[in-house]
Amino acid sequence: VDALSTDGGCIPRNVTLKAGLELVDLDGLTMLEFVKKASLMPARILNLSSKGHLSVGADADICLADPIAKAPVRVISGGNTVFENGKIFNGTPTAFTTRKGLDFYNDQGIPAREVNPSFEPLNRLN
């Protein structure tokens, strides 16, 4: 399995975090494998080069989680805290969608970013 992800609104938020940390607890994944499959690999599949990693030029999106509670504690987006200890502070979520979904989000007044998924073989080494 290259990536852990959800397929949109029918799946509750944070299911990837909760389920992924349960896999870590069961020794199905190491913590490093979980982080890679929940962040870096989905970003690569969706050709989002500024997402899924912490490095110079990246978007500075970070989720700090409590591994015991299997829940987010703090979320930083673009360098700004947008969620902490159950409270949403500010910011507007951005939907990631293919071209076919852009009109739907625009009609709803929800910011959306077009993604072009890659079906090329992934570089799994780094």
Regions found by a protein language model. Give the residues of each.
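Active-site beta-loop-alpha junctions enriched in small/polar residues
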Residues: 9
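Active-site microenvironment of metallo-dependent hydrolases
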Residues: 12-18, 22-126
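Hydrophobic faces of well-ordered beta-strands that scaffold small-molecule active sites
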Residues: 2-6
